[in-house]
From Swiss-Prot:
This is V-type proton ATPase catalytic subunit A. It comes from the Eukaryota. Belongs to the ATPase alpha/beta chains family. GO terms for molecular function: ATP binding; ATP hydrolysis activity; proton-transporting ATPase activity, rotational mechanism. It catalyses: ATP + H2O + 4 H(+)(in) = ADP + phosphate + 5 H(+)(out). Its EC number is 7.1.2.2. It is an enzyme of class 7 (translocase). It comes from Brassica napus (Rape).
Amino acid sequence: MPAFYGGKLTTFEDDEKESEYGYVRKVSGPVVVADGMAGAAMYELVRVGHDNLIGEIIRLEGDSATIQVYEETAGLTVNDPVLRTHKPLSVELGPGILGNIFDGIQRPLKTIAKRSGDVYIPRGVSVPALDKDCLWEFQPKDFVEGDTITGGDLYATVFENSLMQHHVALPPDAMGKITYLAPAGQYSLKDTVLELEFQGVKKSFTMLQTWPVRTPRPVASKLAADTPLLTGQRVLDALFPSVLGGTCAIPGAFGCGKTVISQALSKYSNSDAVVYVGCGERGNEMAEVLMDFPQLTMTLPDGREESVMKRTTLVANTSNMPVAAREASIYTGITIAEYFRDMGYNVSMMADSTSRWAEALREISGRLAEMPADSGYPAYLAARLASFYERAGKVKCLGGPERNGSVTIVGAVSPPGGDFSDPVTSATLSIVQVFWGLDKKLAQRKHFPSVNWLISYSKYSTALESFYEKFDSDFIDIRTKAREVLQREDDLNEIVQLVGKDALAEGDKITLETAKLLREDYLAQNAFTPYDKFCPFYKSVWMMRNIIHFYNLANQAVERGAGMDGQKISYSLIKHRLGDLFYRLVSQKFEDPAEGEDVLVGKFKKLHDDLTSGFRNLEDETR
């Protein structure tokens, strides 16, 4: 007689062979060791125990396998069955991904909530990632029966929503001659829409693909990125730009605004699709995204307003979910991003935060009794981070028609105590090309985004020079001057603390005042106002141009302006006589982009001309 355990028979399923099963020998938190697993493969997906918990093999030794389980392991006992699936951890890719919210192993949270009627995910729940019964409007492209088709070719278009066209591609590892292509109509993800014959073997395809998450999707070639990622944040777009296909890190202590910057990028960046991965962060942050995004709209070039959620996919793996699934959530997110990249879209992926993933690696590494490296993190931490960040880039996609796509990765890092020498931060900085360092002191002064302009950097400035030359030939010189002013202010601050502001030369007083203008009225930005939540690039350029124009004119006036009685033009005189122009400089940020580019550029040009004439009149009066 089979033994009972917890009301369940400890027998094997009728349709499974006994050789497909191992049995649990040891349970240690999320790590399970199973015996009788001869023939299993690394990173093979397994089902552990009577609840069919999802796990992944991470070490093989003899016929025993070490498994990291992606669900709560409470209640597992020795000799519980472990079922092998003979396939790696994979994600389902097809229509229905956008606007959805998944957990770390691509289980749809809305569907689970409806089925279980509970706020928590039941253990061992098995729900298909995408709705197989939903009908999609299928429109085949210019292929006919008898045509040859290869991996990556786009053979149909599906209307996913009013913002995104979903292109259906042949999986990268398939090829052959078309024997059947479904006519235009409505089909579900179960329906066969394409049949191929290759070397006498027929194979049928639906609109759905599965892809192992740890394997990067193949591309024809990698390209040099040359288009900026415009975020709508002045400090990032003007001083530390990234590119479409770049890698960025946002390290910062708690309360510095990492999540707000990540969300601003998701809302306002010039990406076609966004994958937002909440990896080990607070559940409230994902709830905030879920509440905010459906109400947020973006204005399309044709004037239509569309919900941001229509281009967004959320992967939620909050801090109270099992730690092992944090690693899976990062890989799930990047695989979904690569899928949209292969359609020819520019995709942004936000990972908030990679430090929590590294902590999960540390915990599992400790349970495996591996040799710890710096701060207890495993020695392979840098290699794992690199394998993730290297999946970013601008690429030429496989198959036809010829198209380019890109994946931009923005990883938030939460170093304990804001210490940038933390192993995760230093390993990340050795890989990424853009560093947006957040400063606790700026955040405490309520200066947001709290990006420290003295320690941040971007290695893409040279790659973007051709774009800037086309957009505005003066911009590179203006930006260099603005950086010099901010750096000079930092040097002068020590002198000011010793001798006071009044003892400085007139030129230094102008430098300090211009730096204050740049800091408070240019770099600082209020994300909760209609006029400043998003700043178009033309507005950023004109605001900086006018501030630097004021700086140059003031310096020239001070140098040239000796009066008849030897009275020089001082900074206090400039501020007293040109107070209204100074006020207009401060108020540039209040110009609302909703008025349109032509109106705003006209206002900024008028201020530029008024500054020139104002200083000319001042010099004439004091001669």
